[in-house]
Amino acid sequence: MQCRDSGKKATIFEFKRSSASGFKNINYADPEEFANASNEYCNAFSILTEPLYFGGKFDDSKGFVRMNKPLLMKDFVDRKVMIDKAYSENFDCILLISDFLSTDQVRDLSGYAKALGLDVLVEFHEKDRFDMIKSMDGLIIGYNRRNLRTLKMEGEEEMINNLIDETDNPFILESGINGENIERINELKFDGYLIGEAVLKDKEFLREIKNLGVIGYDGSRSYN
């Protein structure tokens, strides 16, 4: 995902059945239907596998594997056994939510995942967590506009935009990206976006994303 100097953005499209914020996916009951509809517009896919709050299941990833693009396992990963599961289910990347993990946990779990050949997306919402992870090598960093403790959207992406040059890691923006804010957000320095609800709700938004300049995908199943 080395696109900071390319003038283009990378996009990760997310499949989920529901969310703790109240979203319900009514357009794509079949994950493979969403994969087919959105494949040409994105660089990678994120699959919600967390069952309690998001109705996720690992079987949902099967329809995306044949698209030959990187797959991110989206869950509250806090144990190595969960990373083993991601590896065994042919995911390419895991998510670590730094707001809920200690510094030692992030280092330990990310190191374990990378030793298996997996990429690691470490997201944060609270600014002090960025200070913790910005110097860790070999990560993808994500700023989540949603406060996961309150589930409220508290986007401070303009402020976070000023921090991007403090790290050499790819830096993406997550949550609440839609047709109302994408043009403004696209002027910021983020390397890419993780987009879920907007692409599941609005099929026209897929084409809008492409028109804004998705980085060309080369077929290699890696974010780097």
Task: Give, region by region, the residue ranges found by the protein language model.
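Conserved N-terminal beta1-alpha1 strand-loop-helix module at the mouth
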Residues: 1-71, 78-81, 118-139, 148-156, ...
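Structural motif
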Residues: 12-14, 46, 95, 142, ...
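Short secondary-structure boundary segments
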Residues: 15, 49, 98, 145, ...
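Aromatic/hydrophobic pocket-lining residues that form π-stacking "cages" and hydrophobic walls in ligand
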Residues: 64, 106-110, 163
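Hydrophobic, well-ordered secondary-structure scaffolds
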Residues: 70-101, 106-126
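Catalytic cores of alpha/beta
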Residues: 71, 78-90, 126-137, 165-166, ...
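Glycine-rich phosphate-binding active-site loops on the catalytic face of alpha/beta enzymes
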Residues: 85-105, 142-152, 188-209
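Glycine/small-residue-rich hydrophobic helix-like segments
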Residues: 140-179
